[in-house]
A protein has these predicted regions:
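N-terminally biased helix-coil "hinge/interface" segments that flank
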Residues: 2-676
Length: 676
């Protein structure tokens, strides 16, 4: 918590920013005239997110006198959706594909993302001009009851639905009549062509609905209990704000919400217009670039983990590297190679802080054993998700899940056969079970650089890990301190590699594997030789995250770059959440399916005009009107609309032929705030 000299008495309007990450929930109280007045952190409580939210918010409220009655806006950013995709988690969802076939699953990673979740194919869809192929609902009607028993949400993707959404709407209405499941339509998420990738985006959105709903419900419930009557906003992946109601319908847009908020916060806290921003959290490190004070956007759609979506978001490069990253021993080598991530574990020091007896007892038993065991230093516990989210488990998964409790148990007790390890991994992927193990956070406790949790558990965890053997037969390390120093060095190196990987990608330089390049290795280690290698970013590094002051001075030194760690670096996401704007963009298309006939498609509308000027006028008006309405729905007070167009109309044999016209309207403004 950032301390103040006694309760701060305020008379002006206050904004409350909240960021819910995988490990911590942050809160800030912000005034447009005085900046950050108070900030605090509390552990994120996945089984009941309201506990973490209330813990952080109550602390900042206690620092500012009369704050509750002065709060006019609450804004929320989160890394939960990002972390879920990085770690392969999310609820089970059913996919309904209209006009597609099984062969389309092979494109854009859709089959991999779908996994064992059910898919139903329907005849139907439209062509590029919005003309339909007849829709056959019979297969869905026959399977809908069974489907509703095994999934938590439904995703619908229709062929060329962005040009005519009628079939997606018909399927959506049927699902809503027959079930109470949340439904996502692809045309509501993107106006871009590319059916399989739009289907992928829709599927991921459906999987995230329950997770984001739990966060918004927890936050809303807490605010109501405290009598805080202010609009609740959520940060989108491009840094803009949307209302909580809109976020519930389009949770996929909150992927990279936390990182986007951190970029907005970094600009606000440092005043730097041009910078490389690296935000290290518990689960991920997120790297992006500020150009002229504005985050670079990813024109191809946000990539998170293995998936490239159609969500417009900051050009953020997300790496499975953080303070809670899994420490892994690279098997097979003569020397003991260590690597971090991409999976997040609960640090042993945190697990013992929350449950001292079972964790310390388990580690002490393993440390005193005659020889190291395969599962030493690992514990399993339930995340506490509602029982409904455990639907669709196989008998083997259900049996193992029943044996796992809300309190950590050693893996060598939980697992009775090696085949159960794969079963456990599936439960982890569903977000039902969390593994505790040795992480960089534990290493920092061993070295005395962090002290907020149980240092004895960290030391015992390091001792147990040290007993593992490299290919040479030697132990991984001779002491807990040696192991911890190696983990710290590994985190520094992988963090530097993450920054370079992101910058090379932004420069369009491909074909260089930073982790394997001898050139990069010589540059980062500054190894002596006949040739001196060097590599240096052209702008300063802004380091964010609670552990940034611990890790990033060494990262900046390795990169030979000037660095800044702002005063409120640990809560930059929460700051960014309250200083952003609402921004909505709507695109309407005009095509010429036949000579003298002009099709207007977009914003849920399909119309035919005989006059090109009339079609253009309708498209321009529709885009502007819908963008303004969308901004108002998303919580803007007085949105300002900007219009642009791109008309592709070549002259062929002396005649103009319309290929496509795009009319783009963007409405933006500050969010509405509660009356004083």
């Amino acid at each position: 918590m950032e301390p103040l000299n006694g309760p701060h008495i305020m008379t002006s309007a206050l904004f409350l920013g909240i960021d819910t990450g995988g490990t911590y929930t942050d809160a800030v109280l912000y005034s447009e005239t005085e900046g950050v007045l108070a900030s605090a952190k509390a552990l994120t409580t996945r089984h009941d997110l309201a506990v973490g939210v209330s813990g952080a918010v109550e602390t900042v409220l206690s620092e500012v006198g009369g704050a509750v009655s002065r709060i006019r806006l609450v804004s929320l950013s989160t890394t939960l959706a990002t972390n879920a995709l990085v770690e392969g988690q999310g609820g089970r969802a059913g996919l309904v594909m209209i006009g597609f076939g099984p062969q389309d699953l092979a494109r854009d990673g859709l089959a991999e993302a779908l996994g064992t979740d059910p898919v139903i194919y329907l005849s139907g869809g439209h062509n590029v001009h919005g003309n339909e192929t007849p829709l056959d609902l019979a297969p869905l009607e026959a399977q809908i009851d069974a489907l509703s028993e095994e999934v938590s949400a439904v995703a619908i993707a229709g062929y060329f639905a962005v040009r005519n959404p009628a079939h997606e709407i018909a399927v959506r209405d049927l699902v809503r009549r027959r079930t109470s499941l949340p439904v996502t339509c692809s045309h509501d998420l993107s106006s871009r062509l590319g059916g399989p990738r739009r289907a992928l985006t829709t599927l991921l959105n459906a999987r995230l609905i329950s997770m984001v709903a739990r966060l918004i419900d927890a936050t809303s419930g807490y605010l109501a209990s405290r009598g805080i009557e202010a609009p609740l906003m959520v940060v989108r992946g491009d840094g803009a704000l949307i209302s909580a109601a809109e976020a519930l319908m389009r949770p996929i847009e909150t992927i990279l919400s936390g990182p986007a908020a951190s970029l907005v916060g970094a600009r606000h806290l440092t005043g730097l217009d041009n910078a490389v921003v690296s935000d290290i959290g518990g689960t991920t490190t997120d790297v992006a670039v500020l150009d002229g004070g504005i985050p670079r956007l990813d024109g191809e759609g946000a990539t998170v983990g293995r998936y490239r979506t159609m969500v417009e978001a900051v050009a953020m490069h997300t790496f499975g590297l953080g303070g809670d990253s899994e420490l892994r021993l690279e098997e097979g080598g003569f020397e003991a190679g260590l690597t971090l991530g991409p999976r997040r574990l609960m640090p042993l020091s945190l697990a013992a802080h929350l449950w001292p007896q079972p964790v310390l007892a388990g580690l002490e038993r393993q440390a005193q054993a005659g020889f190291p065991g395969r599962y030493d230093g690992r514990f399993a516990l339930r995340t506490g998700l509602p029982k409904a989210l455990a639907a669709g488990l196989t008998p083997q998964e259900a049996s193992l899940y029943e044996r796992i409790t809300l309190e950590p148990q050693p893996l060598d007790v939980v697992l009775t056969s090696t085949s159960q390890r794969a079963t456990l991994d599936r439960l982890v992927a569903r977000g039902l079970v969390l593994i505790a193990g040795f992480t960089p956070s534990d290493a920092m406790h061993v070295l005395g650089r962090q002290d907020q949790w149980n240092a004895e558990a960290a030391r015992l965890g390091a001792e147990v890990f040290c007993r593992r053997k490299a290919g040479s037969g030697r132990p991984v390390a001779d002491s807990p301190a040696e192991l911890a120093e190696r983990v710290s060095a590994r985190l520094t190196r992988q963090s530097a590699e993450a920054v370079l990987t992101a910058l090379l990608a932004d420069e369009g330089i491909s074909g260089i594997d930073v982790a394997k390049s001898a050139f990069i290795d010589r540059a980062l280690t500054r190894a002596p030789g006949l040739i001196r290698f060097g590599i240096r970013p052209d702008r300063p590094l802004v380091a964010l995250g609670a552990s940034a002051p611990v890790h990033y001075p060494a990262v900046a030194d390795m990169l030979d770059i000037e660095s800044f760690v702002p005063v409120h670096a640990g809560v930059a996401n929460a700051v960014g959440a309250v200083v952003g704007q609402v921004r909505e963009t709507v695109t309407v298309f005009v095509t010429e399916p036949d000579e003298g006939r002009y099709a207007v498609n977009g914003a849920g509308e399909h119309q035919i005009f005989k006059n090109r000027a009339d079609a253009f006028a309708r498209a321009r008006d529709l885009a502007g009107t819908e963008a303004r309405l969308a901004a108002i729905r998303s919580g803007a007070d007085h949105p300002v609309v900007e219009l642009s167009d791109h008309i592709d109309m070549p002259v062929i044999e002396g005649l103009e032929k319309l290929v496509e016209a795009r009319f783009i309207a963007t409405a933006s403004g500050r969010p509405r705030i509660a009356a004083g």
